[in-house]
Regions:
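Alpha-helical transmembrane segments and immediately membrane-proximal extracytoplasmic
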Residues: 1-436
Length: 436
């Protein structure tokens, strides 16, 4: 009987991993669905209704991209108030993606004691139009849920502690529909460490199978739900990348433009870190200030708001209707706005908005130069991600499925250029301020 128990536990474990991955993918889809429904009501239905009511009394205000001119200011300031008060009274805020993965890699688990509060904290800034991504808060929630399941399945073997890592990989794979990035990111730069009861007791080959099962389950669930009920978010997909002699001549200038946009991100990150540190423990004041800045940017450049995943698909269809200067300015402003939101209490991720910044920047330069749009987008986005992440291979893995095979070389070269040129010292975060 004992000889049968171990193989049975392994099969049962792999089945649990597949189910866990599927549930993670379904949870990601559901989160995106709720986010889209909430944003649609708050930013389309509601201002449209207000605009129609005030059209006769104040026709000058019943204009603009939201149907009511001061609507972003009202909602973003109200959002800052809600987010700040929620953080102050609950003490719960989503951690950034690096912190989530660091805890999962180091401890093999993630705290799930406030999972419900964390879910709402991850959703609120997105609903109120924050220029942040869903990946950080959502990955933390899924890692916590997987830890909860692993703790309760532990009697079947220590291998069940792998559910947290597998769930994190599954979440990242579904979020970005990037299986290679989802597989590598949570494991990059880590050692096995000392083996013990708390460690994952799986040989390396079997461990890879476990993680791939989780990723397969997550992507399957996410894509199937998207087919059944309508696709929800994910990174944009470009069908073709034309690479001619003219485009190759522009590769370096485009990559440098993306790199400079990445420097803007780092400059804003350091500046708002210092501002946050100077303001001290005032979560409400910080969040309201971020709301005011967000509203001002959104009223002038509407695409600077929101995470950017849905907006990227919209921009693909209608970028030619916008002036090149507006698209390029949007890319730079959004890159500065994202760390501003993050450091002033609108917590979330930065990948989705930064990718959108690269897309907007690329389309702007495509209109300006007449070069192939997908090529410009690939070069600008990859260089921007390389400059922000400082890891060109990881940047390329993240964007791998956005572009066809012909664009991979362009992506790699641009990402290397973006990451290779050292970040100016003045833009590098202060260690003490960062910790504070």
């Amino acid at each position: 009987m004992g000889s049968f128990a171990k193989p049975f536990n392994r099969v049962f474990f792999l089945l649990c991993v597949l189910i866990t991955g599927s549930l993670a993918g379904a949870f990601v889809w559901l989160f995106f669905f709720l986010m889209d429904v909430g944003i649609s009501f708050l930013w389309q239905t509601l201002p449209g209704w207000i605009g129609s009511v005030t059209a006769e009394l104040l026709p000058v205000l019943s204009q603009g991209p939201f149907g009511f001119v001061p609507f972003p200011l009202i909602v973003c300031v109200l959002g800052g108030l809600v987010i700040g008060l929620y953080a102050k009274h609950t003490g719960v805020e989503p951690e950034d993606l690096n912190s989530v993965m660091a805890k999962v890699k180091q401890d093999g688990r993630y705290d799930y004691s406030h999972i419900g509060k964390l879910s709402l904290a991850a959703l609120l800034p997105l609903l109120f139009g924050g220029s942040i991504g869903p990946e950080a808060g959502l990955t933390g929630v899924i890692a916590g849920l997987c830890t909860w399941v692993g703790d309760r399945m532990r009697r079947f073997g220590a291998d069940f502690r792998a559910l947290t890592v597998a769930g994190t990989q599954a979440a990242l794979a579904a979020l970005f529909t990037a299986p290679l990035y989802g597989f590598v990111a949570p494991l990059s730069g880590t050692a096995d460490g000392a083996r013990g009861e708390e460690d994952i007791a799986l040989p390396k080959a079997q461990k890879a199978v476990v993680y791939l099962c989780a990723i397969a389950g997550a992507l399957s669930a996410f894509l199937i739900l998207g087919q059944l009920f309508g696709e929800n978010s994910g990174l944009p997909r470009f069908d073709a990348v034309e690479v001619g002699s003219y485009e190759l001549m522009l590769l370096l200038p485009l990559a440098l433009a993306g790199m400079i946009c990445g420097w803007v991100f780092h400059a804003a990150n350091k500046g708002t870190m210092c501002l946050s540190h100077a303001m001290g423990n005032r979560p409400v004041a910080k969040a309201v200030l971020a709301g005011v800045v967000l509203a001002i940017c959104g009223m002038a450049l509407p695409y600077t708001m929101f995470a950017g995943e849905s907006q990227a698909h919209r921009l693909m269809e209608g970028y030619s209707a916008l002036p090149a200067a507006v698209l390029i300015t949007t890319g730079f402003v959004k890159c500065a706005l994202t760390p501003t939101c993050l450091n002033l209490g609108w917590r979330g991720g930065h990948f989705f908005p930064v990718i959108f910044s690269g897309v907007s920047l690329g389309y702007g330069f495509a209109l300006l130069t007449g070069a192939a749009p997908a090529f410009c987008v690939a070069a600008c986005t990859s260089a921007l991600m390389g400059a922000v992440m400082r890891q060109p291979i990881m940047a390329a893995l993240l964007l791998m499925l956005c572009f066809p095979l012909k664009g991979v070389v362009v992506m790699l070269v641009a990402a290397v250029i973006g990451a290779a040129i050292p970040l100016p010292r003045v833009f590098r975060p202060n260690t003490q301020t960062d910790r504070a």
